[in-house]
Amino acid sequence: MTDKTFLVEIGTEELPPKALRNLAESFAANFTAELDAANLAHGDVSWFAAPRRLALKVARLSASQPDREVEKRGPAISQAFDAEGKPTKAAEGWARGCGITVEQAERLTTDKGEWLLYRAHAKGEQAQALLAGMVSTALSKLPIPKLMRWSDKETQFVRPVHTVTLLLGEELIPGQVLGIHSARTIRGHRFMGEAEFTIDNAEQYPQILLERGKVVADYDARKAKIKADAEDAARKIGGNADLSDSLLEEVTSLVEWPVVLTAKFEEKFLAVPSEALVYTMKGDQKYFPVYDNSGNLLPHFIFVANIESKDPQQIISGNEKVVRPRLADAEFFFNTDRKKRLEDHLPRLETVLFQQQLGSLRDKTDRIQALAGWVASQIGADVNHATRAGLLSKCDLMTNMVFEFTDTQGVMGMHYARHDGEAEDVAVALNEQYQPRFAGDELPSSAVACALAIADKMDSLAGIFGIGQHPKGDKDPFALRRAALGVLRIIVEKRLPLDLQTLTEEAVRLYGTKLTNTKAVDEVIEFMLGRFRAWYQEEGHSVDTIQAVLARRPTRPADFDARVKAVSHFRSLDAAAALAAANKRVSNILAKSTDKLNESVNAAVLKDAAEITLATHLVVLRDKLTPLFAEGRYQEALVELASLREPVDAFFDQVMVMAEDEQVRVNRLTLLSQLRELFLQVADISVLQ
């Protein structure tokens, strides 16, 4: 039998748009794993996904599993027969499990003994007998947080299922998947093409669906068409479409037959901050905003219809009518909010809870104000501006605009602060206090904004750890992992002279008697050092490089960064492996020794040439290294320390460390201790593999 193309399509009601790609990719990965586990040879596995279907197409699927030889070793002959030569119960049970009698078993003889052996030729199963079950298994493993039941069925899936098609070439594979019998029926677009049609051969998919059903099943092709058509539409009106990938993905998952159209709104709405308008267009309506070449919002938007209309203007007008009330709301909120100063919203923050044990948002504001001022004093920022930004930091949460359009928090604070005549760096800080919001996001641009962003995040870390509610597993309701990494990124990338120890102590101190966890400072620092580990692993640094630095527990993030980069560079040196091994050896020797070491090496006690040479090198190096360590020039320091390879190797080759003479032994141990201490000024390189 020849290899054939296999098709599975699951026809559903509208699938969750934000999960569609993940569902399809997981389906393909799961089914591929099932094929491989069943030893069914196959070619490429392609996936297709549209709002009402998930499908896979497998090229060159083998018609059956390969035949195989089966061998099962039974009990040893000594255990298989009793003294009279009769089969024991163990032998009979084994034979029964193999479907034979003991007498039919073969014997396997090796140099270790003799055993009963069952050998058979197992014929591979036909693919058609396996496929329905494999599809069901692959679907059952999809990442679906909430399952649905429908009708009177016990079956559960992400959305109700109406059709299942399993085709191997031209052959319909019988069976049930998700309670639905396999059939040749394919459903087309809801309003275009044929509502239902039959498919004769797996090779016809997805072209038959495109031609007869008016559905573009190829997800990436659909996405590419939307992107290209939207870019073209924007060019025609002299603009550039905001085609953020997340929205492009969502829109792709909402339509089966994409038709890109351009609409407009009244220019008067451009007086409203563009962020609020864009929030409405992108978040609520799934429209693509359009900007001019200077980055200014144009009074146009691009949207994607799911139908090819004879009168597209009617669809355009309908969308313009839908968005106008939302833009009018934004205009009203903006004008209403500006009748009050931002500071006037402070009293209302007392009515909003930050956390039951930690008080209101007004309490948090007071702490942020104080901590932002403290941070500003440490990093050379304007303390008055930082404290002012801290005072106003949460006021915009009480405005009508932010209440209605939650994602505009921060940015609306900036606009309202400018309207009130606040200093520009104060206004900008209100917007940038939440940065970085995600991996790769921009950092706050000014020192005042950095002070506010650090204060806001550290207040949350100190408070939540202070009441013993640190993140556990994948539960992190206060987004403390993101907050910790944000603080570290700001300090490291802005090269700020902040120490996590004093920073955390100040954040905890500002809570007064509210905190119950006496270990909060240490736990916050350990948590943040753990975030360092995750961050640097993603940056490509090896685990043991990071561990070497963590062993020293440096609490100044900029210093930590310099050490990691220094150790990574050190590893590229020829001497690195030998010196890491030597440090490990020194560490073990010192750990096992019970001798009390001297404060310094006694030159008069040095005997062997190798130990004299090493001691001399250490004296010279110590003078060179002292200013390098003081200035945090760790890479230069480790390059200098690499010069110790030859004297260290010679020392271990020629010198007996644990000499019988106590004075000599202690002097040599002291020498090794001083060697190790020099390396420990940077990191514990003994952990390097």
From Swiss-Prot:
Keyword check for Metal-binding: no
ATP-binding keyword on record: yes
Any single GO CC term annotated in Swiss-Prot or TrEMBL for this entry: cytosol
Keywords, alphabetical: Aminoacyl-tRNA synthetase, ATP-binding, Cytoplasm, Ligase, Nucleotide-binding, Protein biosynthesis
Substrates-to-products reaction catalysed: tRNA(Gly) + glycine + ATP = glycyl-tRNA(Gly) + AMP + diphosphate
SUPFAM superfamilies, A to Z: HD-domain/PDEase-like
Entry EC number(s): 6.1.1.14
Pfam family, one: DALR_1
TM region positions: none
BP terms from Gene Ontology: arginyl-tRNA aminoacylation; glycyl-tRNA aminoacylation
Subunit (UniProt): Tetramer of two alpha and two beta subunits.
Protein name, as recorded: Glycine--tRNA ligase beta subunit
Natural source organism: Pectobacterium atrosepticum (strain SCRI 1043 / ATCC BAA-672) (Erwinia carotovora subsp. atroseptica)
Gene that this polypeptide is encoded by: glyS
